[in-house]
């Protein structure tokens, strides 16, 4: 086992690595945005949610002379802080009714986690916290049963921080999404470890086949000429397979560079709802994700795209320069996309977001701004949810609808 993740009986904490810090920061930022946006209705007085940490570890790390929270404590404190923050602005108090399920298959890690919780004044029999010793997959049926028994919509976040890529089968993720409507998964996946150790024989193994790795995939990977581009394209192909085989509608990769191992790790966010993906995308921009996918940020497709081999310089990252580029790309790409989905009638903005959500690095706000520009340029007309025309320049919302302008315009007449 990697020595940076060993919690022994002597109580010594493992030293935290930079990429682990970053991973936990991403998790924390995501949870903050999640809670800040999930309860929109001021009349709502309760939020039921279960947070599952399927690979919880021992709860804390050493960072020089300081102690740093591990993922179980990040989950607990994110909920405690959200409860305070959200109630500051509310007349009707909101209760976050959260349950926590922590799983680890190392007995010593479970013991360390219990010690850590106790030292932070969580009672051993705290009814909100369940700790399982054993593998995540073995405990998954009991976890799902626990959630569905009391939560109709199954609002839950699964943080699945495996070491490599073999402890969370795609079938487990499909089971989560099939069982719980409002579930989200944040999956750690050692994407470069998988690629670096691929052998011809891997194509025969179900472990690899579940990620779409077959003989053709392996031979394309081995024959790569340009290391950076070949790796980026193969990572992309793998992401597309993981997305397709996970049963999730939305997929957002967040790349973390491990200096110790000299390789990329992927933290993927998987969800069934566009709003959830939009929240994760907000974290990408905030944290300047080092996911440099090949190609434009405006509209793209994950998955292998041979044409990108010719455009080695077109890597996209989440910088301010890219944000400007992204707006320009969206201005050019959206009209034809809207026309394609619209089929001549009206198009709800919510549907547009759901259609293009996986294929853009733009957040909903970025897309609203571009739509607003297109409306001001009379390329589009915007109707409110009750069908009233909106003045160009007014704020656009997810419930609005788009129609083509009565007069043909530059974009639409040029393209169709
Ligand atoms: C990367 S560490 C987790 C770190 C922790 N999530 C954090 O951020 O503080 C992975 C943990 O998963 C545990 N583990 C390994 N295989 C497992 C499995 N199949 N099911 C559950 N836990 C497992 C290990 O014992 C280890 O504590």
Which role does the model predict for each range below?
Residues 266-276:
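Conserved beta strand-loop-helix elements of the APE1-like EEP
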Residues 165-175:
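A short, conserved alpha-helix within the catalytic core of class I
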